[in-house]
Amino acid sequence: FAFLGGQRQRYAYWGFEACGTQTSFSWNQANLKHGPKPEEKERIRLLPIPLSMPQNRGDENLVRAGEAAGQAEQAKLTMLAWELYRRESVQVRREPERFLDILCSWGARPYACIRQGAFAGYVALCVDPKRDRAEIKEMVLEKGVSAKAVLHGLADSLGIRQGTVTVDYGKQEMMRELEEICESQNLGWGHRFLIMDWPRVLTAMLELKQYCSPLQEKEAVLGITEPSGKRTAVKIRVEAGKITVTGEERKEPRKGEIELTAAMAARMLFCSTQIYYKELEGIPESWFPLPLYVSEQDCC
């Protein structure tokens, strides 16, 4: 599949549909003051990942030494962050040499999360310079690292006491923790997606969903028709924990197949609003919506 941001109708012309599922949480100063607080051993310090060394005047040898130290620190933190990102259940391929640039998309700045002197994760922040507010564009943490400790760390290290953070479906523990402290949450669309290989995308997303919660056993066929007129009969089968999705290009529908346009399929299979549609009656509720999600940092 392909994905991008931007105005909906502009890209719908090319087959991109607004869909996907993402959950955003908002927190404020009162949540930090009165909500659950991390233990001392869980506390997080935010350390900026250097983007470049300032040009200092003075002793040339000292300047060179400072630049070398800064470059070494940048390389170390960037590689630790990249290696951690590579272990994510849902990810877009990011080459090591471009990883830092991608984290800086949309004006964000990357920060390393330090716990007890060791690297514990990273965040990409868009900070409002006029207020003590930030948007966490991406937050990736080592296993066992507290998300609420990161929010408190933002206040302690950077003076940021309110903001929003978006979390993907696979991070169930992080979602539960944020639900305990945050003021509100919002479930909405991700970006604009163009699905080019329905069987492959459905297989990957069904496997991810099954990783988080079991899928009911059944077999169903979706007839998905593209704007070009191409129709693919997508057969989904879940049996004994095994997921099989195949696609067959044929024009004539058969009895029992559910007919959808590509745009309808994108909205119904990948959006939380699918519960309001009748077209998917008979399909197990545990199958859909599927957790199609990519970080906004990749949408640049």
Residue positions per predicted region:
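Short, glycine/charge-rich beta-strand/loop segments that flank catalytic centers
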Residues: 1-11
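Active-site/acyl-donor-binding loops of N-acyltransferases
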Residues: 9, 15-34, 141-148, 152-300
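Amide-forming acyltransferase catalytic core, primarily the GNAT-like/NAT-type
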Residues: 22-148, 152-164, 169-172, 184-193, ...
